Amino acid sequence: MAEFVRAQIFGTTFEITSRYTDLQPVGMGAFGLVCSAKDQLTSQAVAVKKIMKPFSTPVLSKRTYRELKLLKHLRHENIICLSDIFISPLEDMYVVTELLGTDLHRLLTSRPLEKQFIQYFLYQILRGLKYVHSAGVVHRDLKPSNILINENCDLKICDFGLARIQDPQMTGYVSTRYYRAPEIMLTWQKYDVEVDIWSAGCIFAEMLEGKPLFPGKDHVNQFSIITELLGTPPDDVIATICSENTLRFVQSLPKRERQPLKNKFKNADPQAIELLERMLVFDPRKRVKAGEALADPYLAPYHDPTDEPEAQEKFDWSFNDADLPVDTWKIMMYSEILDFHNVDANAEQAAHNNDTVAG
């Protein structure tokens, strides 16, 4: 039985196993406080995220279960890696991942990025997205603060709390406004993996320019700013709008022509502009795919088709339409955590056996 210890962080009780020491607050995640800690087992620095009261409502239980399942399933160099997970006696959940020193938002607010860093960061974002999308997952909330970076410039995408199934009927409204794809704002009816490519394009533009490309004050202003640069949406995109109010709003806007991006980004590499043009396209069906973008000439210094893996299997979304009581989600969550620790223990045992044989 694990021994739990308590610590007070910003007035919040962290109740964690004695394996983790030296807790220091590093920020707030989407649904909880994040601390750095030292893992006594591995001597590595880790991030510990507290998800408060995951069993308080069926909606929160389901969301927590979804993030847990995703973190278990997604295993890739450019995706944050789950190293431990447990539920405390107070029934809060703690998710332990590797700790990276900073995030892209902090980097962008501290100094302009040199060309080779912009290329390398964009390459890693797209490499991660190629894998995520091949698993049948859409991140939906890609933004600079969800992109973690270490001192070696290794990059990892995090915060899959809002991620959803690839579904042509996907609904709702999610990501931070500046990075939100127009089809989310326009239709509220259906969107797919292309929303992440739009977000990545906005992040790419911000790396080139040093400031957000579309800093809208609200949804209406956001869309207006987008059309100033990219022009009025084509008729076949407007035809997909389901909401009468949204349709009237779009039709009321003055007709605008798409502006050449090279006029906006005067100092940027022409190849960077060409790739950005392929990412920031109104029609999601014509937006470049992650795998195609990786093969773009701009990313040639890093592109290696033999080292840009796809997921071995699709993520199982069968639970996603379930409307279950808290107690059922709780049993399912405990089952997933037990499975994670069993798989982990078996992998360690296999590695130990191999070492013994090799020795």
UniProtKB/Swiss-Prot annotation:
Protein name: Mitogen-activated protein kinase HOG1
GO cellular component term of the entry, any: nucleus
PROSITE patterns referenced in this protein's UniProt entry, alphabetically: MAPK (PS01351), PROTEIN_KINASE_ATP (PS00107), PROTEIN_KINASE_DOM (PS50011), PROTEIN_KINASE_ST (PS00108)
Its EC number(s): 2.7.11.24
Reported regulation of activity: Activated by tyrosine and threonine phosphorylation.
Ligand binding (ATP): 26-34, 49
Swiss-Prot/TrEMBL domain comment: The TXY motif contains the threonine and tyrosine residues whose phosphorylation activates the MAP kinases.
Entry's Gene Ontology molecular function annotations: ATP binding; MAP kinase activity; protein serine kinase activity
Family label: Belongs to the protein kinase superfamily. Ser/Thr protein kinase family. MAP kinase subfamily. HOG1 sub-subfamily.
Gene behind the chain: HOG1
PTM comment text: Dually phosphorylated on Thr-171 and Tyr-173, which activates the enzyme.
Organism: Hortaea werneckii
PTM annotation (Phosphothreonine): residues: 171
Annotated localization: Cytoplasm; Nucleus
A Pfam match: Pkinase
Modified residues (Phosphotyrosine): 173
SMART domains, sorted: S_TKc
Its biological purpose: Proline-directed serine/threonine-protein kinase involved in a signal transduction pathway that is activated by changes in the osmolarity of the extracellular environment. Controls osmotic regulation of transcription of target genes.
EC category: transferase
